[in-house]
Amino acid sequence: MASAVLPQSNSLTSAKCSLVSPSRNSNLNKVGVEASGEFLRLQSSKNGVNQSLHFGLVLRVGQEDGRGCRKPRKTTAMLKKGGRKTPDKEYPWPQKMKPEDLMGSPLRFLSRFKPLPQKPKPVHLPFELPLVDIQKKIQEVRELANSTGMDFSIQLNELQEKYDEVRRDLYSQLSPVQRLSVARHPNRPTCLDHVLNITDKWLELHGDRAGYDDPAIITGIGQIEGMSFMFIGHQKGRNTKENIYRNFAMPTPNGYRKALRMMQHAAHHGFPILTFVDTPGAYAGIQAEERGQGEAIARNLREMFGLRVPIITTVIGEGGSGGALAIGCCDKMLMLENSVYYVASPEACAAILWKTAAAAPQATEALKITAHELVKLDVVDEIIPEPLGGAHSDPLTTSMNMKTVIMKHMRELLKMEPDPLLAQRVAKFRKIGSYQEGVKVDPRFKRNMKPRDAPMEMGEPKLLPSHVHQNLELSLKTASTAATTSE
Amino acid sequence: MVMSVINWFEDRQKFGGLIGAFLEEATRSSMTNERDRRISVNANKGLWARCDNCGNMLYVKFLKQNRSVCEECGYHLSMSSMERIELLIDPNTWIPLDEDMSARDILSFSDEDSYETRILLSQEKTGLTDAVQTGIGYLNGTLIALGVMDFHFMGGSMGSVVGEKITRLIEYATQRLLPLVLICASGGARMQEGTLSLMQMAKISSVLQLYQVQNKLLYISVLTYPTTGGVTASFGMLGDIIIAEPKAYIAFAGKRVIEQTLRQKIPDGFQAAESLFDNGLLDLIVPRNLLKGVLSEISGLYLSVPYNKN
């Protein structure tokens, strides 16, 4: 161990040592110095930890422990060598796999979405209070029966019947405000819950290949009835911890770009696309704005009308405005019975139009956001019924209902050629909107609109009957004649 | 001339209201153009406007001549849609489309006032049937399809009428192979029409798919103060070339929404055009007096492509 005074070492190291402050120099003399090539290694006599001296800068300054020796702070290098091991990133496959595990499909080991260890606590919505009361009474009577041993079965049956009747009454006539609270229920099944229920095989794919894998959007390939589909959806969390990880299903621009990449990939290979909408809206944050949240949504909207595969969108929870529409431009729009689709959340709408957030119930009624109202407005094609009590009371039945309706529409769409399919998609959205024209307008109402000042030679601009509809009719005609001739 | 009018204005304070009234009458009769009078009366109920940026007092007549740009600091004040059409379209070449289309209260929406009442009041107050004017005209000799949104009508909100008029304009441009210029100014989607307004975003994007991607025609979007919400998230950001006016406020989520989500103050100039330009979201920032020339030069560049074999 050379206890050399540093300035005496060779020119290379001395040049670097001169950068060290004089106050530390005195301390450095007390520790061993081992010059090795490019940089010096200071070895403390105590416990063999290296403190490398890169170009004269001491990287770690330890505290003096009284004897003049510097005590190094614990570095991660040290942890890895001796003591406590840093935990490895948790993988979804078991650490030790038994040979039986490898027999079935290996895909199930790749999914990080495992069933929750504990069943979620039941949450009762405000309008379900009568049910809670009856449930409590049933519980009391049962306890009484157990403790006294007397037979209370008649009362129990009566109470149970009453419970079922009240439940049926409540859930068959839900108001829009009540449906909104069911759509936002914390235990409502999420996108992945439904996907794992309806698919036989599931492979989740990740990343936008441009910097981030947004956990708020789920993409992957699944197989139903022997056919592979591309699944894309917003994923909410099942508890608070998951919700924070998933950002409450509010995607960033990276999420939309991931969805677009997957949709273009699906169109390239021929996977029909099934999307699931369940988001309060796109994430409103500083970085989201800087990375182009508006542009990401706009690009998705435009590109979805050019994808040459069938697209079916199902709204499974709340559909929040542009953030939902960015994966919702489809051939068929389906909604679960208790889901909602709005242009602005009722709270935001109330704050802007009624000037107070307390008017949210009135806004909910006025905006017409529930599934039944949207079917009347010709926005939604079909409603998927939910079991009594909402989707959260029986997720499996909800998923099976959804599967039936989706496959029914998919079978129809799979028969179509790409060009008529695209034309039909454009036509579906082309007819949405309500306006009036041909009614004479008071000239005062047009005084700030520039009237025509072009000469008559320029002609009258006549829009030829929308070529969209022309192409659609033409393609449908050719498709039907082709079908008849092939038979 | 300007100095003496300013002196008059100051003296008016000294002499009281009656002479002030006389002053307005005197200058009003000197204005020959019918339109000028209406606009000057509409603007701040007087002949003077204040620049939002430097606080300078600006004589409205000269302000209009200078295309609503403050002489002192160059700040672009808001401009009505009629003025924008006159800024861009060659005189005596404008043909409007769908002038008589107006909104319908499909949801029977009623907050403090019913939607129907609001429409009539806005139409009366602004002299516009809805928040957009569409039509075709010559721009420096090239026939273009032009749509101009107006922030004065219900905050430029996009409803079924805006969606339908712009869609028809794009369909017309697709059929006649015209370049398209859309000038955007909007506060977002029209909440009174609910989910129908949302679907207008998809509707316009679908015809843009046919126009831009399938027919490979040129679409230039010009973003002005302010462009927010549904318009930014649909056709505003889909231009082949995106131009913004200096210091325009361009956002997806409004400032207040972001502050509520993050619970922190937003830095100034966060959603200004210059900031978006630095983040790579815009192609150009063009001042108003150069806009017409720049648009015609761009369309000239795109028309003279030599390898049009695809």
Curated annotation (Swiss-Prot), chain B:
Coiled coil: none annotated. Its cofactor is Zn(2+). Gene3D superfamilies: 2-enoyl-CoA Hydratase, Chain A, domain 1. One of its GO terms (molecular function) is zinc ion binding. GO terms for cellular component: acetyl-CoA carboxylase complex; chloroplast stroma. Zn(2+) binds at residues 51, 54, 70, 73. It is found in: Plastid, Chloroplast stroma. It catalyses: N(6)-carboxybiotinyl-L-lysyl-[protein] + acetyl-CoA = N(6)-biotinyl-L-lysyl-[protein] + malonyl-CoA. Belongs to the AccD/PCCB family. This is Acetyl-coenzyme A carboxylase carboxyl transferase subunit beta, chloroplastic. It comes from Adiantum capillus-veneris (Maidenhair fern). The gene is accD.
